[in-house]
Amino acid sequence: MNWAAAVCWALLLAATFLCDGSAAKGGRGGARGSARGGRGAARVRVRPAPRYAGSSVRAAAGAAAGAAAAAGVAAGLAAGSSWRRAAGPAELGLEDAEDGAPGSNGTGRGVYSYWAWTSGAGPTGHRHLCPLLGGALGALRLLRP
């Protein structure tokens, strides 16, 4: 592995650890109290040891798996395999023709789309990290202006 790839992996893992989402959870998740049947439960609960020490390790493992999958797809495309490209948000695919068909429920793409439900989400608050990573990649001449 050359030094540029090693630095890119190091920056990716550093960003994963810095952007850990454990603080964004806002307390303990899941059903609490009587919703879990807490009234008839035993007072002492044995908790199994966690498989990983923190969510950062899971996120780093997921990022590494995603990068490996992307590298496999890129290698397959470079080898000349004929993969079908997924339709973007503004493009119509083969499955979208039933919306205007007679007997359909008449709902358009914007009603049940991912973008319609998540467009109100605000920024995550990690704005300082993007210029830092962009500057590091620009210094390595890996990011084209």
Swiss-Prot record:
Prion-like protein that has PrP(C)-like neuroprotective activity. May act as a modulator for the biological actions of normal and abnormal PrP. Glycans are attached at N105. Its main location: membrane. The keyword Cell membrane applies. Residues 120-145 form a propeptide. It is found in: Cell membrane. This is Shadow of prion protein. Belongs to the SPRN family. It comes from the Eukaryota. GO terms for molecular function: nucleic acid binding. Transmembrane segments: none annotated. Mainly expressed in brain. It is a lipid-anchor; GPI-anchor. N-glycosylated. Residues 1-24 form the signal peptide. Keywords: Amyloid, Cell membrane, Glycoprotein, GPI-anchor, Lipoprotein, Membrane, Prion, Signal. One of its GO terms (cellular component) is nucleus. A lipid is attached at S119 (GPI-anchor amidated serine). GO terms for biological process: protein import into nucleus. The lineage of its organism: Eukaryota, Metazoa, Chordata, Craniata, Vertebrata. It comes from Ovis aries. InterPro entries: Shadoo (IPR029238).
